[in-house]
Amino acid sequence: MIIDTTEVQAINSFSRSESLKEAYGLIWLLVPIFTPVSGITIGVLVIVWLEREISAGIQQRIGPEYAGPLGILQALADGTKLLFKEDLLPSRGDTRLFSIGPSIAIISILLSYSVIPFGYRLVLADLSIGVFLWIAISSIAPIGLLMSGYGSNNKYSFSGGLRAAAQSISYEIPLTLCVLSISLLSNSLSTVDIVEAQSKYGFWGWNLWRQPIGFAVFLISSLAECERLPFDLPEAEEELVAGYQTEYSGIKFGLFYVASYLNLLVSSLFVTVLYLGGWNLSIPYIFIPELFEINKVSGVFGTTIGIFITLAKAYLFLFISITTRWTLPRMRMDQLLNLGWKFLLPISLGNLLLTTSSQLFSL
């Protein structure tokens, strides 16, 4: 029997090409997953380093300086240490709720990144209800905190969980009303459409100038949702030891630690998207019309410019929130609830009515 070697070679080359196609397909399937995860991880490490450096400057002391140049690897060293810590469980607590709580808190925050546009056509899910999806997802996180506090079987943990739930409900409503006002101005609930609506007039087209009252309410509500000083009542050290985190150690405690900074980064990015023009360069079009659309140039250059502009605006808000944490005293629980229900809620309602009236009269 005579075997045609050319046919065998053709079959082998075809099988190799098919296997290469499968390998490339698998790689391209994993790239959209690992790219946001790596970016978010690096972002959290940078935020932790910035907070330590800024707080050291405010308190006139030396910040982290040993782990890496300027102490930039200190957060990574602390995270590595937490990975090897023992994971303790409360003897009389509900271990299922105790273990599920941190996962619910961090997963709900991670899902919020799916609707954030980091650049022109650079968003994981451009949904028509993007901002409402973020509000719905973020409202799940306090459930995880309440489960953690209840499952710990500790009075301090349970009080912290109850405070977290009450605080979230109090400030979620004004925040939602501010988002509704922005949606009325943009005629859309999509985060991409909201950014595009602000790009018509450059710097002066930002919703910051069209909604100054809503911006102030959104800023305060975002800080309260992130449980940052002066709104860190759920984990007040002087009153509740560490709040709902009291019984946690090891990787579970690390998840709560990471979740707080992830939530802060999400809030900063949504301030950028809703009020600061998103990825747009925002140079006044009267003076330099060529640069006004520079970040919409297709390719790697335009994508890089859009990401850089978005992150630069977000880190400006981060600087404000970090400075606020290390300069203002903590509020009492009654003051916090009164601020949300008696002050921010009526203001946000009035802002929504004014926005609705102006939109109706402009028709």
UniProtKB/Swiss-Prot annotation:
The family this protein is said to belong to: Belongs to the complex I subunit 1 family.
GO BP, sorted A to Z: aerobic respiration; photosynthesis, light reaction
HAMAP family reported for this sequence: NDH1_NuoH (MF_01350)
Species of origin: Platanus occidentalis
Alphabetized NCBIfam families for the sequence: PRK06076.1-2 (NF004741)
Pfam families in the cross-refs: NADHdh
Role this protein plays: NDH shuttles electrons from NAD(P)H:plastoquinone, via FMN and iron-sulfur (Fe-S) centers, to quinones in the photosynthetic chain and possibly in a chloroplast respiratory chain. The immediate electron acceptor for the enzyme in this species is believed to be plastoquinone. Couples the redox reaction to proton translocation, and thus conserves the redox energy in a proton gradient.
Sample GO molecular function, one term: quinone binding
Transmembrane annotation, as ranges: 27-47, 98-118, 127-147, 248-268, 300-320, 336-356
EC annotation from Swiss-Prot or TrEMBL: 7.1.1.-
Superkingdom field: Eukaryota
Protein name, per record: NAD(P)H-quinone oxidoreductase subunit 1, chloroplastic
Reactions this protein catalyses: a plastoquinone + NADH + (n+1) H(+)(in) = a plastoquinol + NAD(+) + n H(+)(out); a plastoquinone + NADPH + (n+1) H(+)(in) = a plastoquinol + NADP(+) + n H(+)(out)
Key words, A-Z: Chloroplast, Membrane, NAD, NADP, Plastid, Plastoquinone, Quinone, Thylakoid, Translocase, Transmembrane, Transmembrane helix
InterPro entries per the UniProt record, alphabetical: NADH_UbQ_OxRdtase_su1/FPO, NADH_UbQ_OxRdtase_su1_CS
Subunit structure: NDH is composed of at least 16 different subunits, 5 of which are encoded in the nucleus.
Membrane topology recorded in Swiss-Prot or TrEMBL: Multi-pass membrane protein
A single GO cellular-component term on record: chloroplast thylakoid membrane
Subcellular location: Plastid, Chloroplast thylakoid membrane
Top-tier EC class: translocase
Gene name, Swiss-Prot/TrEMBL: ndhA
Signal peptide: none
